[in-house]
């Protein structure tokens, strides 16, 4: 929990100051900033010295506004047409007796430098974000805080919201922040999305169809499944995110690399358009964009470079590690260094038997027997497996964490969190050492959503969590048989469902009924056993 910030000039001389001083030129006033706070860019609080009279304060306000206006006119005539949105000038004036007189506002560096040299100014402090001190936002490494709870949730959602191996009490309970995903666009670069599905609540839209002559419809189901895991009301990690279908693969689950590259390019350009719209005030509440690509093949520099370029323009990108039980560095886009490359885990916290591994795999997420949205009707669901199913968990998590940031049009907005920083934080807070059957040089990191807490800074500050190893039970044969029965009908190769498509609808319904009838009884026996 953040401590109360108590600042005094005398305290600045302490051994480990909470406030840092920037260099002082001559008699210029110091600029203070808290070392443990989130700074609001270009926003400052200025305190006058005690001897300053009301008349001098009034003159100072007139003086600072003239300087500010002059600086803004100069910038507008040069190359900064939108400076008014960043540097708003005088915002508040303060007078609490004679002990605290001052003002706050948004100013550029040259203006602040002039303020520093004014003889009536005691100090300048960088504005920063403050938070409520509610106990519910006190996040420890286990993520204990108040949260919304989705009951009867898919096991994958439950797993990323709990630190320890799932138990009978947690296997179907997803802890989450209700606003997760709000203001975030998710580009699903795949076979398309069943945008009419009820689980999307109207938040799914058709973005672009790349293959020539193909229809604006998901004829495969793979992309719809991924979209549901990212943003579905019941099946999704980030339940308020908007989904944009970017179709690069045809109904048979295959496509050309040229089309895939074009799809990534379209998503990147669309993202930049939304960024501009937010800056121009045409879109309120925009938080950023994420993308998921649960496809791939052999190593290709073009695809890796394309994904890295999309990340460089601001898209937070998740990609599947691949399903060949091999080194992910030999596959693309799994080898794209700037994306988050995702391996698959099973319900017993083992690495899924098909999942690729190695140093190019950044993190793991649930990918075996994942229930999500499907095609055929607006209510259809399906259970399939693959790193294709793991990657959307991470894409949804990126959207979830992005939504906990201030919107780009907010006056309290921080500098936009970069994909590089978000990736680093995602890995920093992951559960460490939870997975078994992990080859050498493979990060043993399992994704975590903060346990439903909505204070992103507190989640990051809490850091990682070392999992407690549990002995594997021998009494899981019935669960294993159920998983094998599901997987037998859906053969997953390089992230694509390529077998049994014609019979999926009837068999999926039967399997879904079988799962609902059996899962509580089977998992109760299994999970109670491994808990001891």
Task: Tell me what each language-model feature is.
Residues 122-125, 153-214, 291:
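Acidic-leg catalytic submotif of subtilisin-like serine proteases
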Residues 21-39, 77-156:
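Autoinhibitory propeptides
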Residues 48-50, 107-108, 125-130, 163, ...:
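Active-site-proximal beta-strand/loop segments in catalytic clefts of secreted hydrolases
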Residues 269-295, 300-306, 339-341, 350-355, ...:
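C-terminal subdomain of the subtilisin-like protease fold in secreted/lumenal serine endopeptidases
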Residues 184-186, 190, 315, 330-408, ...:
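Extracellular S/T/G-rich loop segment that most often corresponds to the catalytic His/Ser-adjacent loop
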Residues 159-162, 185-188, 223-232, 254-292:
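Substrate-binding/charge-relay-adjacent region of secreted/lumenal peptidase catalytic domains
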Residues 227-231, 239-250, 265, 270, ...:
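Hydrolase catalytic cores
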Residues 1-19:
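Fungal secretory targeting signals
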């Amino acid at each position: 929990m953040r401590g109360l910030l108590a600042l005094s000039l005398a305290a600045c001389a302490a051994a480990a100051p909470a406030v840092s001083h920037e260099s002082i030129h001559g008699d210029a006033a110091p600029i203070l900033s808290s070392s443990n706070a989130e700074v609001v860019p270009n926003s400052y609080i200025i305190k006058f010295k005690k001897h300053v009279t009301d008349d001098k304060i009034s003159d100072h306000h007139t003086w600072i506004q003239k300087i500010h206006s002059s600086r803004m006119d100069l910038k507008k005539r040069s190359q900064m047409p939108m400076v008014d949105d960043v540097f708003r000038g005088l915002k508040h004036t303060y007078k609490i007796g004679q002990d605290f007189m001052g003002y706050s506002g948004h100013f550029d560096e040259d203006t602040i430098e002039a303020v520093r040299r004014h003889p009536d100014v005691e100090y300048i402090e960088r504005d920063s974000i403050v938070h409520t001190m509610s106990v519910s936002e006190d996040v420890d490494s286990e993520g204990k805080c108040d949260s919304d709870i989705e009951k009867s949730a898919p096991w994958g959602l439950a797993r990323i919201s709990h630190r320890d191996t799932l138990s009978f009490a947690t296997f179907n309970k997803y802890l989450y922040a209700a606003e997760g995903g709000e203001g975030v666009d998710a580009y699903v670069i795949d076979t398309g999305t069943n945008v009419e599905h009820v689980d999307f609540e109207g938040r799914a839209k058709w973005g672009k169809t790349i293959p020539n002559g193909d229809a604006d419809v998901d004829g495969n189901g793979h992309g719809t499944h991924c979209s549901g895991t990212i943003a579905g009301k019941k099946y999704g990690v980030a339940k308020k995110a908007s989904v944009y279908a970017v179709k690069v693969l045809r109904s048979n689950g295959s496509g050309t690399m040229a089309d895939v590259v074009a799809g990534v390019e379209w998503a990147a350009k669309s993202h930049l358009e939304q960024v501009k719209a937010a800056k121009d005030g045409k879109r309120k509440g925009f938080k950023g964009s994420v993308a998921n690509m649960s496809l791939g093949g052999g190593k290709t520099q073009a695809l890796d470079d394309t994904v890295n370029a999309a990340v460089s323009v601001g898209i937070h990108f998740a990609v599947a590690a691949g399903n060949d039980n091999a080194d992910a560095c030999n596959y693309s886009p799994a080898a794209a260094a700037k994306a988050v490359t995702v391996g698959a885990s099973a319900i017993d916290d083992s690495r899924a038997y098909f999942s690729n591994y190695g140093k190019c795999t950044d993190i793991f997420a649930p990918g075996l027997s994942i229930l999500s949205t499907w095609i055929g009707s607006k209510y259809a669901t399906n259970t399939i497996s693959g790193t294709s199913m793991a990657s959307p968990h991470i894409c949804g998590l990126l959207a979830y964490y992005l939504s906990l940031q201030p919107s780009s049009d907010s006056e309290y907005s921080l500098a936009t969190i970069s994909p590089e920083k978000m990736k680093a934080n995602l890995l920093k807070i992951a559960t460490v050492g939870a997975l078994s059957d992990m080859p050498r040089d493979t990060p043993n990191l399992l994704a975590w959503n903060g346990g439903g807490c909505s204070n992103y800074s507190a989640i990051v500050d809490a850091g990682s969590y070392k999992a407690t190893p549990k002995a594997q039970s021998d009494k899981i044969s019935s669960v294993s048989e159920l998983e094998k029965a599901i997987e037998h009908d859906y053969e997953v190769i390089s992230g694509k469902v390529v077998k049994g498509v014609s019979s999926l609808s009837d068999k999926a319904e039967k399997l879904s009924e079988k799962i609902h009838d059996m899962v509580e009884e089977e998992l109760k026996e299994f999970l109670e056993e491994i808990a001891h």
